[in-house]
Design a protein with these regions (language model features):
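Short, charged/polar connector segments at secondary-structure boundaries
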Residues: 1-78
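Short, charged recognition helix plus adjacent turn
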Residues: 82
Length: 82
């Protein structure tokens, strides 16, 4: 079972391909929701040495950054093994 953790926003790397899907209107809507209701959905990251790589929830991470949050709630997942 996954356990919620607190991750430093500055230590989360967003892959270039994932960054290309960013929708600023969606980021604004999620940021507004986070202000009024808090973070409802954890992000997904995987460990990569001293940092973490974003797996899911780009818009949620960017909303947290826009709000000036230093940390974000998420789940640490394992990298897929091929």
């Amino acid at each position: 079972m996954l356990k919620r953790e607190i991750f430093p926003v500055a230590n989360i790397y967003v892959p270039t391909a994932r960054r290309k899907t960013l929708d600023l209107k969606r980021v604004d809507a999620i940021a507004h929701s986070m202000l009024t209701e808090g973070q409802q959905t954890p992000i997904l990251v995987r460990a990569d040495g001293a940092r973490f790589v974003l797996v899911e929830c780009l818009h949620r991470l960017e909303a947290a950054k826009a709000l000036g949050e230093a940390t974000i709630v998420g789940y640490r997942v394992e990298a897929r093994k091929h």
